[in-house]
Amino acid sequence: MAALSCLLDSVRRDIKKVDRELRQLRCIDEFSTRCLCDLYMHPYCCCDLHPYPYCLCYSKRSRSCGLCDLYPCCLCDYKLYCLRPSLRSLERKAIRAIEDEKRELAKLRRTTNRILASSCCSSNILGSVNVCGFEPDQVKVRVKDGKVCVSAERENRYDCLGSKKYSYMNICKEFSLPPCVDEKDVTYSYGLGSCVKIESPCYPCTSPCSPCSPCSPCNPCSPCNPCSPYDPCNPCYPCGSRFSCRKMIL
């Protein structure tokens, strides 16, 4: 159990690290969609170090512009205007890095869920929801109409380059209760690894409460008897005879 706790702690630290790197990359991606030559120092553009008061790289290239010869990564020569939005190499790298971090984060969360599912040996646990990245006071659990709804919402604020940006992150998971579990008996807890466990005091039923016994083979109510050779009331053809039996009138 101690080894399992250490493993869960390491996975939780890795998830927090990936979340932090993902927020940083998202912030870089938001502010790298436009050229900041006249406002801020762009990592791939040296226009702020230009000897002229204004960025003249968008105009015809002159011999006096020595920085553009020294820095081939200056992208102002390839675009008509410096402030024109463009998909540069930094943006493509940021997008690829964000996708890689998302896949890595999803992989870590799946691993954590498998570990938690294997460690839950008691059958009174109805379900578990991973709410990594949310505080316990940001998680809400609602039980209504035979369903359990787990929701969480968080506000993120980024302070980048002197401006503030806000974004919201939320999650909502819903599942149905077994028919033998009462809504009033359902409890939840915020456990290790940022996982919300939904529990019930009684064991959930894996089969119907009153299973139907297999039906007994049906016997015919009135087994068929072999046909009588004739019916005294109605004329008939006796077995093996081509002539009908007629009543004799005396």
From Swiss-Prot:
| Family annotation (Pfam families) | HSP20 (PF00011)
GO CC field: centrosome; cytoplasm; manchette; nucleus; outer dense fiber; sperm flagellum
Q: Does the keyword Cytoplasm apply?
A: yes
Q: Which UniProt keywords apply?
A: Cell projection, Cilium, Cytoplasm, Cytoskeleton, Developmental protein, Differentiation, Flagellum, Phosphoprotein, Repeat, Spermatogenesis
Region (2 X 5 AA repeats of [RC]-C-L-C-D): which ranges? 34-77
Q: Which residues form the signal peptide?
A: none
What biological processes does GO assign it? Answer: cell differentiation; spermatogenesis
Summary of the tissues where the protein is detected: Testis.
Note the segments forming the sequence repeats. 34-38, 73-77
SUPFAM superfamilies attached here?
HSP20-like chaperones
Where in or outside the cell is it found? Cell projection, Cilium, Flagellum; Cytoplasm, Cytoskeleton; Cytoplasm, Cytoskeleton, Microtubule organizing center, Centrosome
User: Where does the record place the region C-X-P repeat region?
Assistant: 209-238
* Modification type Phosphoserine: residues: 5, 10, 64, 86, 122-123, 151, 167, 189, 194
According to the record's subunit comment, the protein's assembly and interactions are: Interacts (via leucine zipper motif) with TCP11 isoform 2 and isoform 3. Interacts with SPAG4. Interacts with KLC3. Interacts with CCDC42.
The domain section of the record reads: The C-terminal contains many C-X-P repeats.
Function text: Component of the outer dense fibers (ODF) of spermatozoa. ODF are filamentous structures located on the outside of the axoneme in the midpiece and principal piece of the mammalian sperm tail and may help to maintain the passive elastic structures and elastic recoil of the sperm tail.
This chain belongs to the protein called: Outer dense fiber protein 1
Q: Origin organism of this chain?
A: Homo sapiens (Human)
Question: What is the name of the gene encoding this protein?
Answer: ODF1
